[in-house]
Amino acid sequence: MPPASRTRVQRRPVHGVLLLDKPLALSSNQALQKAKWLLRAEKAGHTGTLDPLATGVLPLCFGAATKFSQLQLDAPKTYEAIALPGVTTSTGDAEGAVLQRCAVDPAQLAPERLSAVQRQFTGPISQLPPMHSALKKDGRALYTYARAGIALERAARAVVIHALELSLVQHAPAQTAIKIAVTCSKGCYIRTLAEDIGAALGCGAHLSALRRTDSGGIGIERCISLERLQALPEAERLACLQPPQSLLTRHLRVTLDSDNAARFLSGLPRRGAWPDAPAVAVFGADPPALLGVGHIAGGCLLPDRLLSALEIAQILASQPQRQDCGILEET
């Protein structure tokens, strides 16, 4: 990890995606900065915030890959969470002050009751964003108001719960907890979901633990920890990066010959016998390289986000042989 002396390192152009298993107690930005330091990268960005309380899948983008980070922000996410019934807190999670404690009636956690609440919160739902969140109001994050003791009116937001499973687990001796397995759209707050589930059960609840197990088809089994990344020799760390196109697996793939690739990189539309498609990953044939993303309408391929010629050259020049970083390859 970066030493306390903040030793200056020589930065370099790095292009790719690090599939990180974010550790507990670090913010997403802290995890990003540690990985950026370990890779000596010039430019980096993450693909969606995980609270310090949360662990799990956090794709980190470097260099040219940052141009496609929004695609992961918009992707569905899967989580495993633990909610403790009978206790509500000021933040909706274990870090807040206890607001209320109540005895939990076993009937409130009966299988048929859990099934009914599970159905209630599956599909399109409405959520009130928590005050302790990074959502902005008048240019300031809501949590800055909350820390000052100010509660603001917030508009409810529409989100989609694609899949939800509720079950009971033993969290501690003589303490029953609710395990929440959920796949949801962007913008869904799992803390709020845990609170709302507790309210629907009639006993209240707060979020005790949270782990993201999938982000846009990237599973936790493919991720690497910061500790394992740091343990690798510096020369081998770059081999743990996925190429920028790893963020584009759901895009239609189109490959252009050299002439059309050059024109596309200049921002010119190209015509071909392609079906309409809202999201297209565009590659050059010679040399084989990602050019950018676009969309197809009426047989016309239109550029949306392009790599620069320098970025493409750097990616081609630095492509290392993939090494065993302790993660599973996608097949």
Curated annotation (Swiss-Prot):
One of its GO terms (molecular function) is RNA binding. The active site is at D51. Keywords: Isomerase, tRNA processing. The keyword Cytoplasm does not apply. Its EC number is 5.4.99.25. GO terms for biological process: mRNA pseudouridine synthesis; tRNA pseudouridine synthesis. Disulfide bonds: none annotated. The keyword Isomerase applies. It catalyses: uridine(55) in tRNA = pseudouridine(55) in tRNA. Pfam families: TruB_C_2, TruB_N. Responsible for synthesis of pseudouridine from uracil-55 in the psi GC loop of transfer RNAs. Belongs to the pseudouridine synthase TruB family. Type 1 subfamily. This is tRNA pseudouridine synthase B. It comes from Verminephrobacter eiseniae (strain EF01-2). The lineage of its organism: Bacteria, Pseudomonadati, Pseudomonadota, Betaproteobacteria, Burkholderiales. The gene is truB.
